[in-house]
Amino acid sequence: MAATLLDVCAVVPAAGFGRRMQTECPKQYLSIGNKTILEHSVHALLAHPRVTRVVIAISPGDHRFAQLPLADHPQITVVDGGNERADSVLAGLQAVAEAQWVLVHDAARPCLHQDDLARLLAISENSRVGGILASPVRDTMKRGEPGKNAIAHTVERADLWHALTPQFFPRELLHDCLTRALNEGATITDEASALEYCGFHPALVEGRADNIKVTRPEDLALAEFYLTRTIHQEKA
């Protein structure tokens, strides 16, 4: 029987540091406008009426989150994250044991559009596995020689997608797949890869390519541009 349009909980793993940003401040706490990247990311989730609760997994030594307005938000729960992303997601899943479906969203992905989120959430009407936001690969892709800055070969880009977030799955299925994959030593780079490891095939829901993750210093200005443009479009 297909799932109905039930309320959804979200998990945001925010315990990482992001050393590629070359800053002393964890990237999720860098500011764009008058909000941190984390606040932009979380507010995009809470803007959808189906998302009733957001669990944020932070580092046990994190002293920055308590200073944000988010810390007092009634729909937000904070848990201690782990050393790896999967550990933080599992900690978040434990806090929403009553949820049937969960979103997992990157703390440093602040440019999520509401129409993309709505399309992703709609798959719960006829899916038992879930899916992810993704964008088709547009550039020519090259495989590098191991340990060298040299091209090994060109990778056929047909059917290649950039995996984005949020990713959206039945809570119990995601919990079981993450647990099994970690116990068996599998390499888990996102939540969908845990389901793939266990033999499932999540759906690809095409999303906007400007739903970027802030990873490098130059991404900050780009994210600010996208967010400013979106605000102006909403006011128009």
UniProtKB/Swiss-Prot annotation:
Top class in the EC scheme: transferase
SUPFAM superfamilies attached to this UniProt entry: Nucleotide-diphospho-sugar transferases
Pathway field: Isoprenoid biosynthesis; isopentenyl diphosphate biosynthesis via DXP pathway; isopentenyl diphosphate from 1-deoxy-D-xylulose 5-phosphate: step 2/6
Enzymatic reactions: 2-C-methyl-D-erythritol 4-phosphate + CTP + H(+) = 4-CDP-2-C-methyl-D-erythritol + diphosphate
Record-marked site positions (Transition state stabilizer): R20, K27
Keywords: Isoprene biosynthesis, Nucleotidyltransferase, Transferase
Site (Positions MEP for the nucleophilic attack): R157, K213
PROSITE patterns referenced in this protein's UniProt entry, alphabetically: ISPD
Molecular function in Gene Ontology: 2-C-methyl-D-erythritol 4-phosphate cytidylyltransferase activity
EC number: 2.7.7.60
GO BP annotation list: isopentenyl diphosphate biosynthetic process, methylerythritol 4-phosphate pathway
Family per similarity comment: Belongs to the IspD/TarI cytidylyltransferase family. IspD subfamily.
Assembly information from the UniProt record: Homodimer.
NCBIfam families to which the protein is assigned, alphabetical: ispD
Function in brief: Catalyzes the formation of 4-diphosphocytidyl-2-C-methyl-D-erythritol from CTP and 2-C-methyl-D-erythritol 4-phosphate (MEP).
Protein name: 2-C-methyl-D-erythritol 4-phosphate cytidylyltransferase
UniProt source species: Salmonella newport (strain SL254)
